[in-house]
Amino acid sequence: MPEEDLVELKFRLYDGSDVGPFQYSPTATVSMLKERIVSEWPKDKKIVPKSASDIKLINAGKILENGKTVAQCKAPFDDLPKSVITMHVVVQLSPTKARPEKKIEKEEAPQRSFCSCTIM
């Protein structure tokens, strides 16, 4: 594939740092981009995605769908020669399963005493 057909992308993380730029074929899918981001993610960050499903990519204000190709996601103004397209990365970690809370039996519950005051 000729080099001029490749699309150069960089990915802006939540703290303003970048991953990339990398060159991709216009037929590469968003899912492939996410896998690359996860593998190249800086290990010193506080938030680290565990899988590609923890990441959302945004380009030109739109959340990109996994099945779309790079060519389908490019905005019309991205056709500038030799320009690097910046896509924003949002990390949404999968919710962890909450541990079931231990139910306190009525007999085990501590007794609470109440008092009331009456002002006459």
UniProtKB/Swiss-Prot annotation:
Annotated consequence of substituting residue 117 to S: Loss of prenylation and membrane localization
Occurrences of domain Ubiquitin-like (ranges): 7-73
Localisation: Cell membrane
Induction field: Induced by pathogens, cycloheximide and ozone treatment.
Cysteines engaged in disulfide bonds, as pairs: none
Covalently attached lipid (S-palmitoyl cysteine), positions: 115
Membrane disposition: Lipid-anchor
InterPro entries assigned: MUB, Ubiquitin-like_dom, Ubiquitin-like_domsf, UBL3-like, UBL3-like_ubiquitin_dom
Tissues with expression: Ubiquitous.
PROSITE patterns the record matches: UBIQUITIN_2
Pro-peptide region(s): 118-120
SUPFAM superfamilies in the record: Ubiquitin-like (SSF54236)
CDD domains hit by this protein: Ubl_MUBs_plant (cd01814)
GO cellular component: plasma membrane
Keywords: Cell membrane, Lipoprotein, Membrane, Methylation, Palmitate, Prenylation
Lipidation (S-farnesyl cysteine): 117
Modified residues annotated as Cysteine methyl ester in this record: 117
Entry-linked Pfam families: Rad60-SLD_2
Keyword Cell membrane in record: yes
Extra facts: Heat stable and remains soluble at temperatures exceeding 90 degrees Celsius.
Main function: May serve as docking site to facilitate the association of other proteins to the plasma membrane.
Protein name per Swiss-Prot or TrEMBL: Membrane-anchored ubiquitin-fold protein 4
Organism: Arabidopsis thaliana (Mouse-ear cress)
Phylogenetic placement of the source organism: Eukaryota, Viridiplantae, Streptophyta, Embryophyta, Tracheophyta
Gene this protein is translated from: MUB4
